[in-house]
Amino acid sequence: AQSAAASHRFMGINQEGQVALLQTQDTMPSPLPLAMVEPDMGSPLFALGNPLDLGLTVVPGTYNGVNQTSYHPRVHFTGSLNAGMSGGPTLSETGEVVGINVSTAGNQVSFLVPVKALHNLRAEHRARGQGVSDFTQRIGEQLKADQADKFSRLFALEWPTMSLGSAQVIAEIVPFAKCWGGSNSASEKAQFRSADRTCRSEDNIYLSGGFNTGVMEYQFFWLEADKLNPMQFYAYYERLFGDFAPGNKGSEEDLGEYRCDSQFLALAENRNSDSRKSKNVFCVRAYKDFPDLYDVLFLHGTVDASRAAFISHFTLAGVSQNNAKRFVQRFLGVAKWPS
């Protein structure tokens, strides 16, 4: 293993695309040619890999274009990628590499990194004229550029809204953050009425086995007491409010501890003497190896004397301080429970 490592040298990396460029001193067979154009929709493809450590395996499938619901481009490959095939090439009928195996959603729904990511990485290396000396710094630069582009796109859009109970919440902003929700309105046995809405991005940027970033998630909950007394209802509200977690994972080697700021507000009702009690919690943890990047977790909860409650929440992974502040301001300006 040591001799193998000594004969290879990292020359470039694209963390979002999950591809790297290596230089080897070994004598290698002729490289596989890289496709210069995308295949036609429905073209046969052949994925190569070592599934479950069973040896070199060829898996046939079909090209179904670039997934339009992913922020980072991914080829939709209709074929069965399995554990052990990640990083292997997928070839066209003419033997050209059209993508790199990266993930599967099961039921023959799999994804490839487009070969364009390799073309871009090679072009970047040629323009630079030398290898990357500090890979941690380079990855940090790519992560910061990636989040800057993502949030500039988000802030440039109108954020659509929808009703959830008596509250106004944020609907699907962009295709790469899918939304779903539900309610218990059809249940006759429910102790309270509830409705919820969740939107979450499908793009994780892999950094290590226990560390990923790039996730965006926002959630809303509407609650109304029905059969619960006020004490029971408030206890459930408090339990739900404290049950949120970050959208990504990382160890103490990767991330600092969360630092949180809580604010309590009393918002007077316009129409009667009842009051709403509101709580905001804003938590931030820093990335140890990537300065100026943070994970952010935000919670807002409001409960009123008529035993109704509204909770909103978002989590952002790998975001700059400025973009986090802009997001929370925009979020609170759109998601609200009108008087």
Predicted regions and their residues:
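Conserved positions in beta-strands of structured domains
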Residues: 9-11, 64, 82, 179
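Active-site region of chymotrypsin-like
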Residues: 24-31, 55-130
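C-terminal cap/linker of serine protease catalytic domains
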Residues: 10, 97-167
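Short, well-structured beta-strand
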Residues: 139-142, 263-339
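Short conserved aromatic/hydrophobic patches within beta-strands of well-structured domains
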Residues: 168-179, 331, 335
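Conserved active-site neighborhood of the chymotrypsin/trypsin-like protease fold
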Residues: 1-48, 53-56, 71-74
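Secretory pathway targeting signatures of secreted, lumenal, and periplasmic proteins
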Residues: 177-242
